[in-house]
Amino acid sequence: MSALIKKELRLCIHPTVFLFFSFSALVFVPNYPYEVIFFFSALSAYFCCISARENGDLAFTGALPVKKTHIPLARILVTVGMQCIMLALTGILGSVKSAALPAEQQINQAGLSANLALVGNGAATLGAFNLVFFPLFYRSPERIGVPFLLAAAVQFLLVGAFLLLRWSVPLFSETLNGGNADHTAAKAAAMFTGLAVYAAATSLSCFFSMRNFKRVDL
């Protein structure tokens, strides 16, 4: 497994991955729907899969002395690493913003503020993306477009739901909004809830992806 992960890191990581990490700084843009930031992490996974397909990675990897089910698992684990970096950067920069700016400048009129709860929301959207994209992709690894479009649609529906909650539910509009200094425990609970959803959804994604890939004729 470690050899497959090294292969993914050296041969399949697309350069845009590192560019998209910088998009976590969008938390400093006022009145922006910050949950959209995490779409770029999903887009990174798409570009990596496209790059691997165009370079004949599947034929190469299939010829290696590795378990067939480890092939999708390695790709998903590397994607999880990229997504966790994006989540961590967004959380860190959100904390910097929370500490550096006055409270009135931390309220986001377009969605949730850049705080711990945002990390939980982002994790939940990425978990939903993983659960849809990878099992569909590993049914037919040569076809990437439709799985990505469906997964991106689900992710944006969840983003839309979070934006709706921001304006309709006091928990989101009052308790979970604003900087980390206010209602810290509630925001931390929201973050850990989102991370738990991410872990569960991604675990299911691994299971279904490995099951589907077993049936693929290499």
Report residues per predicted region:
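Hydrophobic alpha-helical transmembrane segments of membrane proteins
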Residues: 1-58, 74-218
